[in-house]
Amino acid sequence: MTNAYECTTQPQRSQAADPLRTRDFRLLVAGLGISLFANLMLRFAMSMWVLDETGSAAAFASILTASILPTILLSPLGGVMADRTNRRTVMVALDALSAVTVLVCAAIFSAAGFNLAAIAVMQVVLAVLDAMETPTVQAALPQMFRSHGEDVMRRAMAVVNVVNQTSTLVPAVLGGVLYAAVGAMPMMGITIVGFGAAAVVECFIRLGAPDRGDVGRVTAVDDLRAAGRFLTRERPHVLHLVLICAALNFLVTGYAEVGFPYMVRTVLGFGSTAYGLAYGLVGASGLLGALVGGRVARSLSMRRFPMAIAAFSLTILPQALVMTIPAGGVMRLAVLTASTCGTMIAITLANLIAVPAIQMGCPEDMTGKVMSLALSASMCAQPLGQITYGWAYSVYPAGAVLAVTFALATAMLPPVAHVTRRF
């Protein structure tokens, strides 16, 4: 009897020892991964379909750009919902609505064939639903792990980042093969099944209703005003950290997402094969950063945040130098790729420090709203970075743009150090 008792209680002890080995967290991660995989698989299929039908790569890019504004405006409503209702219910409803949206559009395409307007509406709706789900997931993590401290929160964020990176890389690898083999419509079927499966999985997550805090707030506007007062009056250092993260997103989006492909393809003149290999390495480095972050999560306290930003700035310097001095194309490609991989690792570690600090710096009834406002700020910075760097690379030499980027990243260190001392 003693041996049997020990065998049955050992899993409970190991589960208690590691809060991440819980059924609810595993279901949350599974639902998130399936939903993200379905979303990105659909985006890839639609981009290929639009390109085949219109011959214009800019058409689908314009659709994605048009979805940014409603996403920024409506994302805070997701934060309000996350703090007002059961977060499990919100996640299930949003994934179910995503499945219904794709199903309706698939029926339209089956009856009428290719329709660019329907694709545009579908992508805008899905972008808004995804932006509303993100703060819900980010608010669910503190609800699960707040009592275990920031170390566990950082480990949980690392797991979520690994899932995000994997779910981003897999559709990029499989998307082309599937589209060539079966076409867009069967891939829409895969997406519908994916969203539906995510909703079913999330139904089994056990999450209670969040603490409403001040029940006097009766409208979404009241909730957002309360979040604004909280950030500006009660916890201004949290607001400053949100703004720093938005500034980082501006730099990384501009120099990595815009500058890296421009320098490899246009400045250095490499073909799609070399760029695809380099892009794959950069994507894998983000996954590596999340894995490393999970291993060293206990040491990633806020006092390490300035070191992460300093490491990020140092990854830009070799690129500025190699694009300024005389060097061969292969050497420049190697330095650009290796340094951008370093950038992705440094930024991933910085996110693992900053995001849990923001989450843990908010009370239960503010987490969703604050995270949604942080998401909106980052989304505002993203197109600004794309536009600014697109203009800069077309006017100035790549080495000069990178040198200015290095200077801006270095200039962030004093305010970063100041904010760090407040946590």
Name what the model sees in each region.
Residues 33, 44-45, 182-189, 229-290:
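A single, central transmembrane helix in multi-pass transporters
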Residues 116-123, 127, 152-213, 280, ...:
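Hydrophobic alpha-helical transmembrane segments
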Residues 21, 52-53, 83-84, 112, ...:
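Membrane-helix boundary and inter-helical linker elements of multi-pass secondary transporters
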Residues 27-43, 67-80, 86-98, 118-180, ...:
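Substrate-agnostic recognition of the 12-TM MFS/MFS-like secondary transporter fold
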Residues 5, 73, 77, 84, ...:
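C-terminal transmembrane bundle of multi-pass solute transporters/carriers
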Residues 42-45, 49, 54-62, 158, ...:
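Small-residue hotspots at the loop-to-helix junctions and early N-terminal turns
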Residues 21-29, 116, 120, 234-242, ...:
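Primarily residues marking transmembrane-helix entry/exit sites
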Residues 5-25, 208-243:
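Juxtamembrane intracellular "pre-TM" segments in multi-pass secondary transporters
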